[in-house]
Design a protein with these regions (language model features):
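Conserved short loop/turn motifs at secondary-structure junctions
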Residues: 114-121, 280-283, 306-313, 345, ...
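N-terminal export/assembly segments and adjacent metallocofactor-ligating motifs
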Residues: 1-249, 257, 261, 265, ...
Length: 711
């Protein structure tokens, strides 16, 4: 009491509209900061954002738990002679990194040092990282984890349409389509808020078809589930086109007016008769026919693919086969119709548009195109001849670490490559062989286990930045609070390193918005043209769809209504004969193995494994085993099962489930160490996209004792 009055606790609140740090749906959220004796953050779904409309998954609701987590790295660390990481000043850490980079490049050449980026980086960070590698490092070697995610869909769409945007229409079109096929996407778990559009489509009388080796939560919602053998997606897609042709379901007028190359495709699918397709894929002829009739007969229909058909050594061709089908049915470019890809990472779309990929420059330009190089060189104020050529793709880049002529130093931004890569045991060994490994992240993870330097970075709510969601909608993620003392943003780290490498003049920006202004100019005239987009415009319009080539342009929510982006203006059919996965079951390894996600976790788990509520819900990976296979192996629910491939072995807890095929095992890939599913997976690469074959490999299994480890 003072002067007879009670003490009153002062409470201040401030609410910021921003976006989730996880998947490409990029749910709108509001974060309310309440300050009393301490600061608390309350996260809610934004009811006014038109993509998620007030819905959000458990990952989004718990995302603030990451910001003040006790395991967070809050100061730079260097690994000393003892082999342990120790806290150092920023000056010491940055000087060390720059000195090591210069020494390695002096000894081994400019390409000996590279960077690995992320689909979690904002557009500004992706842009500046690409510029940093090519201008400050003068190295060709940059790629990002989107190569593990979107590369096959991107290559397939570019081949057919001349452009790559995950969805060529707004997500709201899903609710309007009369027939929806979800191919290899368990979006009920991987992107739960999108299901409101799927359920709305069903409630309006639309048909839902799901293609997946597992009876997932998504498949349970479907009128028709095609439970195919892993790795046979390409044959099934070709088989559906065969049926469409045989039964007169194709749109010959559309094919003549808007496409080219159909005759080659027609001839290529003549061997894909339904009986043959059933033998190889396991999908009954009746279901094949039902699926193609639903797509063909509906006034509007669309196919949306996920990682299932894409993360294969023939992923690009499989995407082409899906596009071939929808072109032949005359659906692409029509209302609520066509083909689309459900992008995975938060900025998986924007991350590949602005220079993180080994072969690309900002605006979806190509590094080996002389005119494209000249445009970017002018923006960056460098000689086009000084820009390096195309570098190695993600897995090839990592596989070169420590090898003759390969990487000697690597800077990793926002990616846990030791868990996310196929044949991850190989990558872990290669990381340990580097002369310099720098990990820029908010938490230590499996990749930083052998890092020479760990540089702490700001998190999603601690800086402004733009991202591009699965629709091609550019959005503005607003800062909620300042980063903790001792933490820098990725943009600041790149600027400091560039200065120490003698190229600081092109990296001194006062804000992310200033970086975006340069990005706008860099993308002008490109396929992914952001030149008409500004921070102000994004806030006023709930995001803007690219291309947006001028300040007065409203953006482009829908593509292909009048023409495609190839020089002819037509879509291109591509003949894609079926071929087997790189590794099939045999007598030594008689089972298929495939991977996927849990609703509660995200990608390598580097973030979600730090959130108590998510770990309480899903504390460990479990291997799905069909009851018949479990009986044959002699295991029951909760037993330990040792799963082995030619690359490694993992001991999983068993989950008995009739949702999986009896010839297939499934496990999630969110864990590292001895629980890493990617110890088993196959590094065979798609010849076009360089996507690894995560989704298909051969394994064997037997009961495991509690003391058996992994290798």
């Amino acid at each position: 009491m003072a002067n007879g009055l009670p003490h009153l606790r002062v409470v201040t609140t401030e609410t910021t509209r921003t976006h989730c740090p996880y998947c490409a749906f990029q749910c709108g959220m509001t974060v309310t900061a309440q300050q009393t004796t301490h600061r608390e953050l309350r996260v809610q779904a934004d009811p006014d954002f038109p993509v998620n409309r007030g819905q959000m998954c458990i990952k989004g609701f718990t995302s603030a738990a990451l910001l003040d987590h006790p395991a967070r790295v809050l100061a730079p660390k260097l690994r000393g002679a003892s082999g342990k990481l120790s806290l150092v000043s920023w000056e010491t850490a940055l000087d060390y990194v720059a000195e090591r980079v210069l020494a390695l490049q002096a000894r081994y050449g400019k390409p000996s040092v590279g960077a690995f980026g992320s689909g979690a980086l904002t557009n500004e960070k992706a842009y500046l990282l690409g510029k940093f590698v090519r201008v400050a490092l003068r190295s060709p070697n940059i790629d990002y984890n989107g190569r593990y995610c979107m590369a096959s869909a991107a290559a397939g769409q570019n081949r057919a349409f001349g452009i790559d945007r995950g969805l060529p229409f707004p997500v709201s079109d899903i609710a309007e389509t009369k027939a929806l096929m979800l191919w290899g996407s368990n979006c009920a778990e991987t992107m739960p808020p999108i299901m409101q559009w799927v359920y709305e489509q069903k409630n309006r009388g639309g048909a839902l078809i799901v293609v997946d080796p597992r009876r997932t939560d998504t498949a349970r919602a479907a009128a028709l589930h095609l439970q195919l053998t892993p790795g046979t997606d390409l044959l099934l897609a070709n088989g559906l086109l065969f049926l469409a042709i045989e039964h007169g379901l194709i749109d010959r007028d559309y094919i003549a007016r808007r496409t080219q190359g159909f005759d080659d495709v027609r001839r290529s699918v003549l061997t894909c008769d339904p009986a043959h397709v059933e033998r190889i894929t396991g999908v009954p002829i009746e279901q094949q026919m039902q699926a193609v009739r639903l797509l063909a007969d509906a006034e509007s229909s669309m196919v949306l693919s996920g990682r299932g058909p894409e993360q294969q050594s023939k992923g690009t061709d499989t995407v082409s086969a899906l596009i071939n089908l929808m072109l032949a049915l005359g659906k692409v470019g029509k209302p609520a119709s066509g083909y689309g890809c459900l992008t995975g990472q938060g900025n998986g779309q924007g991350g590949r548009e602005h220079g993180q990929k080994a072969d690309q420059l900002p605006g979806y330009r190509y590094i080996e195109d002389a005119a494209h190089r000249a445009h970017i060189a002018e923006i960056w104020r460098v000689n086009p001849a000084d820009l390096p050529n195309k570098g190695k793709s993600a897995y090839e880049l990592l596989d070169s670490m420590g090898a003759e002529g390969g990487l000697r130093g690597l800077l990793v931004f926002g990616s846990n490559v030791a868990v996310a890569s196929p044949h991850s045991g190989n990558i872990t060994r290669k990381l340990a062989a580097l002369d310099l490994l720098v990990v820029c992240d908010a938490f230590e993870n499996e990749t930083s286990a052998t890092a020479h330097a760990v540089l702490p970075t700001a998190q999603w709510a601690e800086e402004d930045g733009t991202l591009t969601n699965l629709e091609g909608r550019v959005i503005l993620r607003r800062q909620v609070q300042a980063p903790p003392p001792g933490v820098k943003t990725d943009l600041q780290i790149l600027a400091e390193l560039a200065k120490r490498l003698g190229r600081g003049e092109g990296f001194q920006f006062d804000s992310p918005e200033q970086v975006f202004e340069e990005l706008r100019r860099a993308t002008q005239g490109g396929k992914a043209d952001y030149s008409g987009i500004s921070y102000e415009k994004l806030e006023q319009n709930q995001g803007v769809f690219w291309p947006c080539p001028s300040n007065s342009h409203p953006g482009t929510p829908r593509l292909f209504a009048e023409r495609f982006f190839l020089a002819s203006g037509r879509a291109q059919f591509t003949a894609v004969p079926h071929r087997n996965a790189a590794e099939l079951p045999d007598t030594d390894y008689p089972l298929f193995f495939t991977t996927g996600r849990y609703k509660e976790h995200y990608n390598s788990g580097a973030q979600t494994r730090h959130v108590p509520a998510l770990m309480d819900a899903k504390p460990e990976p479990r291997v799905q085993v069909h009851p018949r296979l479990a009986a044959r192996l002699g295991v029951v629910d909760g037993d330990l099962l040792l799963v082995e491939s030619r690359r490694g072995a993992v001991r999983f807890s068993v989950l008995i489930s009739s949702d999986i095929r009896a010839d297939t095992l499934f496990a999630p890939f969110h864990w590292g160490g001895r629980q890493a599913a990617n110890l088993l997976t196959m590094p065979a690469l798609d010849p076009i996209s360089r996507m690894p074959e995560f989704k298909v490999c051969a394994v064997r299994a037997r009961p495991a004792s509690p003391i058996e480890g992994t290798h």
